[in-house]
Amino acid sequence: MRALHKRVSWPPDFKLCQVRLFISEDSPSQVGSESQDHLQAKSPLASHPSDDNLPPGFGGPFSANESQIKLSDIPLIKWKCSVQILLDREWKVVAGDESKEVEAQNERELRVLEAFYPGASSIPPNPSVPADVEDSHHDDQQTIVIPILPVEDDDIAMDSASDFPTQSGVDVGTEPSITDENTSTSSTLPAGPDIMAALSAISNSKEQGSMIDQDLLIKILSNPKLVENLVANRGSAGSVSSNTSSLYSSSTHEANGVVTTAPISSNGQFYAQPPITHIPPMAYTPHAPQDQPNYGAPPARDASYYKNLIQQHGGDRQETPPVQHLGYRYNLQPGGGPNPEMVNSSNNNQRPRDSKPKIMKACMYFNSARGCRHGANCMYQHDATPYQPRNLNNGNINTSDMQNAKRMRFDRD
């Protein structure tokens, strides 16, 4: 059989019809007039959200029957200006009912007659002076100046300290200047020799590192009753001494290195001295020390005596080696100061005072090839006597030295 070919058959012309696409927003009257080039088939409704879900005023199609609101139909409220507020000048003045000046002003108005001036030219240039002020004579230069800046506590303490010498009757300008910084505090307080000695001991204790309770001393010195008792007790013991002994003590203190500001009487008061301009080095010769036992009364106690008492009872006692063991010979220079001269060469090797006790056994490394690495701080004795050279007088070695040397050799073995 022959295969049948498919054929396309077109209907006749009278059966053909024309199909047009239009937008739903367009009115039906405009469908036929517009060109169909831009028209497309509508997409499926499932891809677009429904317009019914949109709130009013957020787009969406307007129906033809919906009425549009005109702005002219909206009623408008006429704006009226507010009432103008007029401020009264009397409102700006505070009455001050609780002020005390109100009563004074009312009494003044009742006492003074009211005056009326017809014109501005008749008004006096100056106000009326109150009756209680007319008879008073006040000078504006004597008005007390009130400082605006706050005054610090340190400034008050410094001012009060500077006022002490003037209150006690001692002129500060007449006293000689003090070169030592440690005794500078003692010249600013108007007290007796006991207080001066205590202050010098406090200043020395700061440098020496002693255990003196400075707060207790300050409390004692700040209490005037305790100070009077101390001065009375000490004054009874030193009342026998005369002015000559005080002058002698001041000269001896300068020789010992203690600087005194002014001579001290038996009452514990200071006497002003004339200003010292320049004294030559050999202006006076000090008294011989053998003249001191001639006085029947005991010598006046200086600041060093009280300083030693405080160091013995209030803190650690720091002993200083005597002068004769230092190997120095003191010769007074023309200026009065000591002139140290070396008289013993062995003092160059002098070791400082050991704080720990040494062991009596000799050090086995001393004077050996290895040597002692501790040096002067070694706990054992460094005795060089067994190694002294031969005696030049008889050419022999001491037998005791030989025995000591043998013992040290056995100890090393």
Swiss-Prot record:
Keywords for the protein's UniProt record, in alphabetical order: DNA-binding, Metal-binding, Zinc, Zinc-finger
GO MF annotation terms: DNA binding; zinc ion binding
ZnF C3H1-type: positions: 357-385
Region (Disordered): 28-61, 159-191, 333-356, 389-413
Keyword field contains Zinc: yes
Biased composition (Polar residues): 176-189, 389-403
Protein name: Zinc finger CCCH domain-containing protein 6
